[in-house]
Amino acid sequence: TYRREEDGDTDAENRNRVYRLSASYGRSDNPLRVGLGRQFAPSLAVVSLFDGIYAEYRKARWAAGGFYGTEPEPEDWTWSSDVRGFGGFFEYGNAPAALRRWAVTTGAVSSTEEGEVNRDFLFVQGRYDDRKLSGYLAQEIDVNRGWRKDAESGDSLTATSTFASLRYRFGDALAVRAGYDDRRSVRLYRDLITPETEFDDTYRQGVWAGVDGKAGRHLLWGVDARSSSGGPAGSADSYTGTLGAAGLTQLGLAARIRSTRYESDVTEGWLHALSVSSDLASWTRLEIHGGFRAESPLHPAIPEGDFAWFGLDWEAFFGRHWLLSLTADRNLGAHEDNDQYYATLSWRF
């Protein structure tokens, strides 16, 4: 439930329902895996969420598969048949039990919207991981036809959507990381949306670098800097520090604090977030989280954007097959008064 103050006297209330139902089949002694319903394709990260069927055949060093389905409505995530897509992939990687783990995936995806050309593209993904170094690279190349070729000045091929990340570990206590993201559009499906996740999504595009580490048995820390451009917020710079602790007490108490300073072309401000979680018993865990964002406009025409949020997240396992998750969140300030409630029930068989 979202309740927003449209003016000083009235409220406008919206109710949204998001569903996700899927079933999959796979066995450790069978190379075939099949999924049906609303799902992500594990080897087709470029596709994001879709409603349809996915199948893959995976051997020790290679895999191949494909999908066919439709895209959900972008605004309310209901089922829609407007955008239909299909595609396939081939993956080749390291031998089993190798110390250096790597894989290269290539494939093609084609989609139409109400029978007309939507998007056709080729893609390549690569990942590498060993004891010290890990990296990921994804590149898409649009194959333009019809109106898309005219929109791209007659070019048949256009390189789009580059994403790269690199991480190097200096032992267990220190690591450095860097990345680059110029993807034009990323459809993100989240079970829970908070001002913290919205902030990170808004400033997603750009380059970043950071360092993180571990002090002692329980303390975790991190610092990073990001320069964003091309996204909905325009050009912006942000600096983030995080501090956390895990494995405290016999109940597995954990805590995390995050603070971000940001400056864009139109606003500047701070974002602070805190979460604390603990096991209530061997089969259930509770998290309390919240935060505050203070934003000051750089132009008089833009209103101030101070607001806060807080909530609870409870998970419980029932037997070997059932997982229940309940979340309640409240956002207030900056002309908003929003309540969000989520319930998820999973059954593994």
Model feature map: region roles:
Residues 1-349:
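Gram-negative and organellar
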